[in-house]
């Protein structure tokens, strides 16, 4: 897989569930993923993607019961980096079509209580201008967890984007038009979790169990309209 064909789409890594972990990844170069954020409640509760100085994109199933700390610009979750910013959340806005049973429209916007200071360590990701296809290459997945242990540092992984047919066959009658799959069906590497926000997948990254991700390109209008009205 060529580097220049990899969509650097942060898959707002969801670590709400025990088995949502990186398999076969590596430690990201420090500060190489400036849009990655941590939803922090005394531990890395979930992940997200900074998409403007005031807004973070995450998964709807990551909505907490109260406001929490959004950590930006971090490489090590426990060690001060000198580049990190800690900002409280102000509002959580789930997509109105989110279905907790099917995980369709598993996407959410988080308004920050104050704007982030943008620099080379904290920088928004660019929303997609079109939907990715399997022939485009793969996706880049950063996360704060690994399958064999819980690392303190940000983990990275590059996995192929799978075709719709492959995705449907892996999860019969469970995939909607708002979902995409990424991973290796032969096992070995996966995020077990999103061109998109990490949504769901198998409990373990086993054979024929790719990760399922929310297709962010289907929600760009909703994202922009919500941000404009917020």
Roles of regions detected by a PLM:
Residues 81, 93-99, 115-151:
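Active-site substrate-binding loop(s) of clan PA
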Residues 1-31, 116-120, 125, 132-140, ...:
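Extracellular/luminal ectodomains of metazoan preproproteins built from arrays
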Residues 1-57, 68-74, 79-80:
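Protease-domain processing segments flanking chymotrypsin-fold serine proteases, especially trypsin-like
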Residues 36, 55-57, 84, 107-109, ...:
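Conserved hydrophobic/aromatic beta-strand scaffold that supports enzyme active sites
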Residues 56-59, 63-100, 157-158, 164-166:
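Conserved H-D interstitial segment of serine endopeptidase catalytic domains
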Residues 28-32, 50, 64, 100-103, ...:
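Extracellular/periplasmic catalytic domains that process cell-envelope and extracellular macromolecules
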Residues 18-22, 36-40, 138-230:
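Extracellular trypsin-like serine protease catalytic domains
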């Amino acid at each position: 897989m060529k580097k220049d064909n990899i969509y650097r789409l942060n898959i707002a890594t969801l670590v709400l569930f025990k088995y949502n972990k990186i398999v076969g990844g590596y430690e990201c170069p420090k500060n190489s993923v400036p849009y990655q954020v941590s939803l922090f409640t005394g531990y890395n509760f979930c992940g997200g993607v900074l998409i403007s100085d005031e807004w973070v994109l995450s998964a709807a199933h990551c909505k907490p019961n109260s406001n929490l700390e959004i950590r930006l610009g971090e490489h090590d979750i426990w060690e001060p980096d000198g580049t990190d910013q800690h900002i409280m959340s102000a509002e959580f806005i789930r997509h109105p079509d989110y279905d907790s049973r099917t995980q369709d429209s598993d996407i959410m916007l988080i308004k920050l209580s104050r704007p982030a200071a943008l620099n080379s360590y904290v920088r928004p990701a660019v929303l997609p201008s079109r939907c990715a296809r399997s022939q485009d290459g793969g996706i880049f997945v950063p996360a704060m967890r690994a399958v064999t242990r819980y690392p303190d540092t940000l983990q990275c992984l590059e996995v192929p984007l799978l075709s719709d047919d492959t995705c449907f066959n892996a999860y019969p009658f469970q995939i909607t038009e708002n979902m995409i799959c990424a991973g290796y069906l032969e096992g070995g590497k996966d995020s077990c979790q999103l061109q998109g926000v990490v949504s769901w997948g198998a409990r373990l990254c086993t054979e024929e169990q790719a990760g399922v991700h929310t297709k962010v390109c289907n929600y760009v209008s909703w994202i922009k309209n919500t941000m404009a009205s917020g």
